[in-house]
UniProtKB/Swiss-Prot annotation:
GO CC annotation terms, alphabetical: Arp2/3 protein complex; cell projection; cytoplasm; cytosol; nucleus; site of double-strand break
Family: Belongs to the ARPC5 family.
SUPFAM superfamilies, sorted: Arp2/3 complex 16 kDa subunit ARPC5 (SSF69103)
Alphabetized UniProt keyword annotations: Acetylation, Actin-binding, Cell projection, Cytoplasm, Cytoskeleton, Nucleus, Ubl conjugation
Function: Component of the Arp2/3 complex, a multiprotein complex that mediates actin polymerization upon stimulation by nucleation-promoting factor (NPF). The Arp2/3 complex mediates the formation of branched actin networks in the cytoplasm, providing the force for cell motility. In addition to its role in the cytoplasmic cytoskeleton, the Arp2/3 complex also promotes actin polymerization in the nucleus, thereby regulating gene transcription and repair of damaged DNA.
Organism domain of life: Eukaryota
Modification after translation (UniProt): Polyubiquitinated by RNF128 with 'Lys-63'-linked chains, leading to proteasomal degradation.
Provenance organism: Bos taurus
Entry annotated with the keyword Nuclease: no
Name under which the protein is recorded: Actin-related protein 2/3 complex subunit 5
Subunit structure, as described in the record: Component of the Arp2/3 complex composed of ACTR2/ARP2, ACTR3/ARP3, ARPC1B/p41-ARC, ARPC2/p34-ARC, ARPC3/p21-ARC, ARPC4/p20-ARC and ARPC5/p16-ARC.
Amino acid sequence: MSKNTVSSARFRKVDVGEYDENKFVDEEDGGDGQAGPDEGEVDSCLRQGNMTAALQAALKNPPINTKSQAVKDRAGSIVLKVLISFKANDIEKAVQSLDKNGVDLLMKYIYKGFESPSDNSSAVLLQWHEKALAAGGVGSIVRVLTARKTV
């Protein structure tokens, strides 16, 4: 019996502390270089009246991996500015132009806008939420609420 135990003791070389669920290691993906969406490109599209291109530009290069709250706030304000400038009739077309990841990202920005409401932004965000929910389904809400990386 003891011979069997000694020969099979190799399994004990695993460091069980490595798999401790209470040991948190923050993953650093090197996202400090992310500056968020290009505000000049977004403003240019808004001035030209190309709202869908403005939305695409605002959702491009999201600051998900950065820890800088100032960059995240600036990106959120750019996206909110684009969402508010849409007409109610054009919202559904714009949401339909996004892919699944784009709808999820849009939903993240919608919930970010709900966190700090400004003048009349809640009504507009609710319209966007309705259309994004129709396009992405309940799964997009679940993915946004359970995501560890925020915008």
